[in-house]
């Protein structure tokens, strides 16, 4: 994953310090592209240990069209907790619960989760019901019927609903491309947290590419990651510098259950990661 480390180095060399919405501060560049050939391995970062369980469950959650953190919390995935908690803190129902106490209530009380665990019409809603259109179903059908189409688009950015979302989509637009029996995917990401978010996104959309390729009888080929504002938060600089000093290891292999022919039939047990060697965990606070 030298490709990722090159991004980190580029930001340190060329980036500008900027204020941001979270008041954390970032070092940022605008406009950057990375390419990952999935024939060379599954691009899961090796210069720190990645939480693959969270990556898989979040992607399945998107594909279900779900927007409530209940499913994630039930599966011990905590990457979205801060946003509904922040909204809950501003409500009349808030009783000075800590984030940990809030998550426990979400996990153990489905009614509480229904009322306070929703993120609004974020990714899953837009993927499966963008103003009445199931984009995932359309994409898969179109890839099969018209693989040369230049309209194989998945869009998460719905301007009419942005003010209802806990966090407007960061990874906003996906385009698929078919050539000689191989499927590629390009993601445009308007905003990317280089330490926490981007390694997660690389693996997630590479996995989506593999899943769509399998159900359309194609071979997964290239994931292209195009970034708008790519930034390192000021409280992540030390962790990123540590990664730059580490030597990337050989990429692992991701094996999908070959019996799955429908995108909606994938379950957590249908993914097996082999030969993943990595450095230790590096932690960092998320900017909300």
UniProtKB/Swiss-Prot annotation:
Task: Name any one GO molecular function.
Answer: thymidylate synthase activity
Leading EC class: transferase
| Pathway given in the UniProt record | Pyrimidine metabolism; dTTP biosynthesis
One GO biological process term: methylation
* Sites where the protein binds (6R)-5,10-methylene-5,6,7,8-tetrahydrofolate: 51, 193, 287
Binding of dUMP: at which residues? 21, 150-151, 190-193, 201, 231-233
* Superkingdom as given in the UniProt entry: Bacteria
One Pfam family from the record:
Thymidylat_synt
Q: Does the keyword Transferase apply?
A: yes
UniProt keyword Methyltransferase, yes or no: yes
Which catalytic residues are annotated? 170 (nucleophile)
Compartment annotation: Cytoplasm
Which GO cellular component terms are attached?
A: cytosol
Name the reaction it catalyses.
Answer: dUMP + (6R)-5,10-methylene-5,6,7,8-tetrahydrofolate = 7,8-dihydrofolate + dTMP
Which of UniProt's keywords are assigned here?
Answer: Cytoplasm, Methyltransferase, Nucleotide biosynthesis, Transferase
Enzyme Commission designation = 2.1.1.45
Subunit record text? Homodimer.
Q: Which NCBIfam families match?
A: PRK01827.1-2, PRK01827.1-3, thym_sym
**What family does the entry list?**
Belongs to the thymidylate synthase family. Bacterial-type ThyA subfamily.
**Name of this protein:** Thymidylate synthase
In its UniProt entry, the species of origin is given as Aster yellows witches'-broom phytoplasma (strain AYWB)
């Amino acid at each position: 994953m030298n490709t990722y480390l090159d991004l980190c180095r580029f930001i340190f060399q060329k980036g500008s310090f900027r204020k941001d919405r979270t008041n954390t501060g970032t070092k940022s560049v605008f406009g950057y592209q990375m390419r990952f050939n999935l024939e060379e391995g599954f691009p899961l970062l090796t210069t720190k240990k990645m939480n693959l369980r969270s990556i898989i469950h979040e992607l399945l959650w998107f594909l279900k069209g779900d927007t409530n953190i209940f499913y994630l919390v039930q599966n011990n995935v905590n990457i979205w907790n801060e946003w509904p908690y922040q909204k809950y803190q501003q409500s009349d129902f808030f009783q000075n619960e800590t984030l940990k106490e809030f998550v426990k209530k979400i996990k153990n009380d489905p009614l509480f989760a229904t009322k306070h665990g929703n993120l609004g019409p974020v990714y899953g809603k837009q993927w499966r019901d963008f103003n009445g259109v199931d984009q995932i179903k359309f994409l898969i059908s179109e890839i099969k019927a018209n693989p040369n189409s230049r309209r194989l688009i998945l869009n998460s950015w719905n301007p009419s609903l942005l003010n209802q979302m806990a966090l407007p989509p960061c990874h906003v637009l996906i385009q698929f491309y078919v050539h000689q029996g191989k499927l590629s995917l390009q993601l445009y990401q308007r905003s990317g947290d280089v330490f926490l978010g981007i390694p997660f996104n690389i693996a997630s959309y590479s996995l989506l590419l593999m899943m769509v390729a399998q159900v359309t009888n194609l071979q997964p080929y290239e994931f292209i990651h195009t970034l708008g504002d790519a930034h390192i938060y000021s409280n992540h600089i030390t962790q990123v510098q540590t990664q730059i000093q580490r030597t990337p290891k050989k990429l692992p292999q991701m094996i999908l259950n070959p019996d799955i022919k429908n995108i909606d039939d994938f379950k957590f047990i249908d993914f097996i990661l082999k030969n993943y060697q990595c450095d230790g965990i590096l932690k960092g606070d998320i900017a909300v």
